[in-house]
């Protein structure tokens, strides 16, 4: 009589330990992803709103002086970049919310995780470039610049301090949004790492 054959499931594929390990990592990625997306949407929305209401007009002995974002291409780019990232973050937050409920999401599969990593990287690059350009203009407006007596940029903030304070707040919010996007990129990379190890 032949001896019975006992099939032992390979560890990491069919075992309960593997399932709970994968489920634990998926829950962490999904919940953290939703939190980061929500915070990013809040930071970028704040930057856009603050920039849009930053216009200020003040009277001087030479007449009226107006500070507004429309007059600075760097500030226009800052608003556009934050608006684009805001829309993307809201859509990603909705998807992340459903992924928490369904226990399946973009970070559960390699192709979608790679796409998430790429889009996050591009969005973070656009946001940091806009924030850096706006920061250079803001510093110039606050401190002025004298290039060996040949060119002089006046300190605009002496006349429109509210405008400068608001733009500074928007720039800070933009850098916060960039930091959150950077963390989202790391999260996608972490998900890809665990997905690749789950195959072996």
From Swiss-Prot:
GO cellular component labels: plasma membrane
Pfam families from the UniProt entry: CASP_dom
First-listed, main subcellular location of the protein, grouped into a coarse class: membrane
Cysteine disulfide partners in this protein: none
Cytoplasmic topological segments: 1-33, 99-120, 190-200
Bilayer-crossing regions: 34-54, 78-98, 121-141, 169-189
Residue numbers on the Extracellular membrane side: 55-77, 142-168
Subcellular location: Cell membrane
Keyword annotations from UniProtKB, A to Z: Cell membrane, Membrane, Transmembrane, Transmembrane helix
Official protein name in the record: CASP-like protein 1U2
Membrane topology term: Multi-pass membrane protein
Summary of subunit composition and partner proteins: Homodimer and heterodimers.
Family per similarity comment: Belongs to the Casparian strip membrane proteins (CASP) family.
